[in-house]
Amino acid sequence: SNPRIGEAFTRLLRALAEGTIDPHEQNTTVNCFLGEDECMSAYRAAEALTSADQPEEALQILTNAVAKLEETGHFADNETTVYRVFDSYAARLVYNQVKAGTLPAPQDCTILQDKGKETQLAPDSYAFCLFELAYLLYSRDHIDEAIRYAKKAITIAPTMSAGYRALGRIFVFNDDFANARATLESALTLMTSPDDIAALYYHLAYALWKSGDPETALASYIKALQTSNVVSAACVSEIEELQKDTGLPLPLSEDIDRLLDEARVPLVPTESMRAVLEEAAITALDEGLFDIARVLLSFVFRYRNDDALVGVLRSLETSLF
């Protein structure tokens, strides 16, 4: 009943009949069935062009690829179905829980609009193109278009941090600190990956600093450092600059959560988020879905250092190899 599936089978059978692919080569067979990913090709080409200092050409390639995909209507939301992108089992789990109303989310969370609809997957490359478009448009001062693509990216990939970070950055550099803070704090409540959480605290810290709240900004920078080292170099550099500008001392590590809480900055992951991850990991174990259980438990372990969890994780890793 799905025309795209029919086209895929026709393409694969024709290639097999003509002998243009080897049926024993799994990757070749899968790629033939899926067809050419024009968005991924455009994304890679745009990366190369951006590195070669040709941003206008990169913009054109990405814009054309996204427009071509959207013209097909294959991944257009409708009254019964939405198309979304996820980068991990945990991200999909959070989406499902928010959509079902069993995990709290901000009132402006785009996931809430998906209630009652079937969720199907869109290509990852579609989201990557939207992220890159938002960044390139912002860097070329096409602010309104950059905001539009960043918001579209958030809708398509609501549990990935890149769209929120792009939108937050655009707001900050247009001195719209209220919207920057709201965007980044909303994103924090939906993330499970320590790297994503750290990156969001880092971007939030900069927004807080430039909005005139350097004390909370310092706490947010340190929270990012406590969470992951993915943005450590940038955090240290900006902390030094902030202290040079303001003369503020570093807050004590044990005071960070209190300072953020007093400033109404979300402390994540919340207990409810941790409980959802742990319960899902146990369910996956019971069902024999060991790969999924390992991924979920690895997140739980990052936030709850438990010797028993170490043993379970090691056992799972052994069973997978």
Q: Which functions belong to the PLM regions below?
A:
Residues 75, 129, 163, 197-200, ...:
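TPR alpha-solenoid repeat register
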Residues 47, 135, 169, 203-209, ...:
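Residue-level recognition of tetratricopeptide repeat
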Residues 70, 124, 158, 192-195, ...:
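Short coil turns that delineate tetratricopeptide repeat
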Residues 37-40, 44, 132, 166, ...:
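"A position-specific structural signal for the A-helix of alpha-solenoid helical repeats
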Residues 5-9, 13-23, 87-115, 175-182, ...:
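Alpha-helical linker/edge segments of TPR/alpha-solenoid repeat scaffolds
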